[in-house]
Amino acid sequence: MEEQKPKGSGMEKIATFIVDKRNLFFLLYAFALIFSIVATGWVKVENDITTYLPEDTETRQGLTVMNDNFVTYGTARVMVSNVTYETAENICSDLESIDGVTSVDFDDTTDHYKSASALFSVTFDGTTTDDISVHALHTIRDMLAGYDTYIDTEVGVDTSADLQSEMSVILVLAAIVIVLVLTLTSRSYAEVPVLIMTFGAAALLNMGTNFLCGTISFISNSVTVILQLALAIDYAIILCHRFSDEHETKDTREACIAALSKAIPEISSSSLTTISGLGALAFMHFGIGRDMATVLIKAILFSLLSVFTLMPGLLMVFSKKIDATRHKNLIPKITFLGKFDVATRFIVPPIFAVVVVVTAVLANKCPYCYSYTDLVTAKQSESQIAHQKIKNTFGVNNMVAVIVPTGDYDSERQLLKDLDSCAEVKSTQGLANIDAMDGYKLADALTPRQMSELAGLDYEVAEALYAAYAVDQNEYGKLISGLGDYKVPLFDMFMFLQREMKDGNITLDGDIQETLDDLFEQLNKAQLQLQSDKYSRLVVYLNLPEESDETMDFLDTMHALIAKYYSSDTYIVGNSTNVKDLSSSFGEDNLLISVLSALFVVIILLFTFKSAGLPVLLIVVIQGSIWINFSVPTIQHESLYFLGYLIVNSIQMGANIDYAIVISSHYTDLKKEMRPKEAIIAALNEAFPTIFTSGTILAVAGALIGVMTTNPVIAAIGTCLGRGTVISIVLVMAVLPQILLIGDTIVERTSFDVKVPVDLSRVNRTASGNMRVSGRVRGYVNGVIDAEIKGTLNGTLNASVTSGTTIEPTKPDFYLPESKEQAAAEWAENYTEGEEV
């Protein structure tokens, strides 16, 4: 069939081009999807959440210094339960003999043996990702397979891979639920594959372009696909239903063009609230907000693109199947709920007001936490179970690193001594307090005589060694004044001796050489962990939890102690400092997101409804759902990870507000045709399928994430999102209608109109049957009409009019005869929504 030239408005021309050039778009999508499949492998995922801390925080700066200057070897806490102390000693010996294990700390103190359980602190020869460490850990697991063993370690743990595996299972389960929901809410069974293919293309395009962001967080990488589906599936459903409506009176091509031209502005407007809510995340000081905002907004934009450019072609291809598989409406009417809302319009709002006030106070007292180490998820990994078991038996193991400028062993020694004297400190470790031999510490300064006695060297050899060291350090004055009182730190002298032996400048006897080689190996590892050219690292083990008021206060005490010996360029790094930095920025980020997300949504609603009052009413309901949602942790006395609040807050305000918009839009339109009480009942019936579809998908997706992932951050987001969506649905269905009814006066008095030019150029159209008319019409109409009319009528008027309507000439018959009133009622029941003439 020859394609017709596009007619009408610019939007119709765009729609015509997309529909007629669908094969071109299919080809472009094929290339884009193949590219995206390949490009998904280019995406870099960041698993360390501290990477997104602001650059000016102590933790971020300290981590940068620490990672650039030191090596951190892998460690493991291995607990073996139900063993005697003698058995534990044998196990310790076996662990020490494993290749790849540097050391095993174990003794008869309660720190390592308690309640018939032994705790071994294992240090590996490599980092957490090195093969030697991973292989050694596997050997430990095999060796202890016959014991009741719990191993808490980060060695060999691939957080990203584990999370992706969990999310794949969640996505499959979510897809099953989605197909069931779409089947229930669809008008034809063949619509479901169209919707799934459209979304699948959008999701793949988004994943395939994530590499453009450089590196994305593990949070964005794991939850974006499911959130994209839950947030954007409405767009495809709107176009699908538009096409179904238009196809009642038009052929496939014309119906698709008409549906797309009307759906583009409608869907674009609907997406603005979601995008604005997500956009608020980008203003967070914590970089994870910008990361999630970028990836999720990109996901929404790709969803829009797929709906506008791919889905019309799919509708054309599946048109016959859609017609052949139509089924009756499977979603029941909820007239009973509408009648309940009408009957309780003076009861529910006051109760809701009280609930909002109470939950606002409770939400403000929500017990937020900033470390997820001790959070317990519904599903726990083997490592999490081990961590809890060891914690319950031997207590916390809270380690922080103190980084100071290198070169002043006396200050390091005194600082470590001051820290050891604090009751909050379990133990400390640094070059200045590590035992060497014969009671000496590594940082102790020795004379040539003391060195000769310690190392078993002739005094002349020791003196020559000291002379060489003085020359190497350009301390020629020591050679002139005599070397007898010249003191050199033991660690520095050993490292100098190693360099000289390596260069062949010094040769020692075989036995001494072998002894020193073993010593040098240990010293090299100590230096890699504790000293660089610029900094020294002191390790401090605290008797405090990672997150508590006492811990935060003691960090201030540590800063004060450090300041006694160092004026600048010092850092404290650890999970506790991370908690302190995150908590200090949370208040500002929280206020910023709450205000911006609400402000963006209000501005959009203001111009959508052309009323200042209605947006406020909608915001009150959704903000109420947010407060109720986050009052639950307070009531349950459960800690909530702060990111769960920040992210879900913006999603609820940006996405759940759509449920309120749908009901309000239908109500605003319907109350022009019927009384407000009847309009709100009809609005609920019309809006329920949309809310049921979107709400069920988002709630189920959130619930699945919350109960099926072991990652505490992701679980917190999922739990809060699922619970918040359910609360939002309940409020918009059982509270918002009452507020709209009693708030009509406010809405009407705060309404305004935006004058826009009217294009009077029209083509003649002919149609018959049941139809909805929207726009300027000039010509002859024969039938029963129910509409707002402003203009000139040349003929006979026989109709019921609302109060305030002016008609000339006077005394027309304002009321329909009973038979025509019945005909009008039948027309209202059977008209085809969306038909325009």
Language-model features: locations:
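Structural signature of multi-pass, alpha-helical inner-membrane proteins
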Residues: 2-4, 8-30, 37-41, 56, ...
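Extracytoplasmic
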Residues: 56-61, 68-69, 81-123, 158-161, ...
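A structural signal for short secondary-structure junctions
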Residues: 393-397, 423, 519-520, 528-534, ...
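A short beta-strand structural signal in non-transmembrane regions
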Residues: 74-82, 92, 107-164, 398-406, ...
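Acidic/glycine-enriched edge-of-secondary-structure segments
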Residues: 43-57, 367-380, 498-513
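Juxtamembrane segments of multi-pass membrane proteins
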Residues: 52-54, 58, 69-75, 83, ...
